[in-house]
């Protein structure tokens, strides 16, 4: 099928980039193989519902990531949102005043210079959308934990999201005390001490706490300074075969488009290692479900890359770091409505096997977090359904065998994962999926 170039702003709150990344340290560490036209790092926005995550992304990037119809109507994030932001630096002003997202320094009027581009992953904070948050956490290099100053701390999903960061292994964290314009100084100090007490003994114990107002753009320079210090650009393996976690997929064609106007399916996500170019062959696993003569199996998809975009910027080479939109020659019906979300794309023959079941080593939490009554977590039992997050994939697994520190699960939907891959485990508690621990795939 012939596909035109899919270089457009992707719908669904997804704007995959704006300008150029200029990180000299990263260039040296990768031997100059870093693509200067794409973001360098993925930073997650996490925290309780309505604490200002999406507003903060807007303040940093100019992109309002809630564009899905239900998101607009309900005023909450439902899907993962994405936006890229260039961090600019004034050559004359000292830190933190030197940092801004503007092309002109708001302090001295000097023309600013591009420092680096970051991709923000806006995760929903509602308790019913924990699976979406966990799939977003899989592509985060660091996170901003947003806590509203006008509410008691911690709120249920503040606790659950911090626990998720800890379990998944995200250690580079900045805490934002948002909505400081809505409270008195006394209340602000009280809330600050609540935050300090809450994070004591956690992965975020030593994280800086930055008081801001995303709505009024207060202390945004201080926040950028903290992000530059606390969440460095990671060094990725560009000499390995390309592997990409798919976080979104789209059909970007408008209804009524003619045959000549139809563009191939688009996948969005992050490249974890290797390099991609237009013209490269791409395998996607597990692929598509095919039923013949009463037998069902999953068949990997093989396609060719037609174009690669970091935001509106078309690139001829994509390296790890930040979010990408990859145009393909796939039938767009295969990619519409996030139908390939959770799959892995990469060099044919190099991807992990497709698993319909696996055995995992268990590491359960002591107590359930994110609920009013934090009850003890019981051992996993045979025949119990569990929600499992592996990379950007979410599936349900039925426990077929369980011991104290090990369980075998049969998956409702297969995943592509290697031995040693980490699995976030959630259990149905009070009609909600609650995070109860982490597993490691053994076989």
Swiss-Prot record:
Binding sites annotated in the UniProt record for Mg(2+) 1: 54, 77
Any one GO MF annotation of this record: metal ion binding
PROSITE patterns in the cross-refs: G_TR_2
Keyword Transmembrane attributed: no
Residue segments, region G2: 75-79
Start and end residues of each tr-type G domain: 38-235
Binding positions for GTP per the UniProt entry: 50-55, 178-181, 213-215
Keyword Metal-binding: yes
Superkingdom of this protein's organism: Archaea
Keywords per UniProt: GTP-binding, Hydrolase, Initiation factor, Magnesium, Metal-binding, Nucleotide-binding, Protein biosynthesis, Zinc
Region (G3): 122-125
Region: G4, residue numbers: 178-181
One GO BP annotation of this record: formation of translation preinitiation complex
EC number(s) reported in the record: 3.6.5.3
Subunit-structure text: Heterotrimer composed of an alpha, a beta and a gamma chain.
Function: eIF-2 functions in the early steps of protein synthesis by forming a ternary complex with GTP and initiator tRNA.
Family statement drawn from the similarity comment of this UniProt entry: Belongs to the TRAFAC class translation factor GTPase superfamily. Classic translation factor GTPase family. EIF2G subfamily.
Protein name: Translation initiation factor 2 subunit gamma
UniProt source species: Methanosarcina acetivorans (strain ATCC 35395 / DSM 2834 / JCM 12185 / C2A)
Gene from which the chain derives: eif2g
